[in-house]
Amino acid sequence: MGAKPALIVVDVVNGFTDPDCALGTACPEVVSANKALLDEFRRQNLPIFFTSVVYHNKEQASVFRQKLPALECLKPDSHWVKVDPLLERRESEPLIEKQWASSFFATDLADQLAGCGADSLVVTGLTTSGCVRATAVDGLQHNYPVLIPREACGDRDLAVHEASLYDLDAKYADVISLSDLLVRLCSLGYGESTKQ
């Protein structure tokens, strides 16, 4: 991890955290882990980005949506595309709308990361085998060291979750515990954030 990590909270939105949605599953432990990370990033005034999958028209990611028809519910005014309220997203924390798995693909995330001076990434969220994995791989391909706290990401299938973390740790990122990451973050020694 560098001196100024950025946190990318991938798709921790109602559609993925609420089992009433076809895309969702109950994952309170993942939400809680993300809240702990957000608290520390906010305390140190480090950069935070949220992402959400949103489709504005039928042409966007049409092949992806044919492969996974449940994505059709992710429309701009839908409850399902809103960040889980337990994370208490602030207006100052950018929300990146995306249409594909990677948070980098066809978005301005790379420009925003460069603009804020981030030198490494902490990638969390849902789902481990999909958008978290794609974002972590693309983060590396943008030449950022990537850390993934295992408790802060999740998947509908535990075996797929574990296999994805194993593969990511082998090739693309450092998968570590939430507690270890929080210790590393505390050691950076940035001051308290201002109230936003």
List the predicted regions and their residue ranges.
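Active-site acidic carboxylates
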Residues: M1-R90, P94, L185-Q196
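Glycine-centered short loops/turns at secondary-structure junctions
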Residues: N45-L46, G117, N143
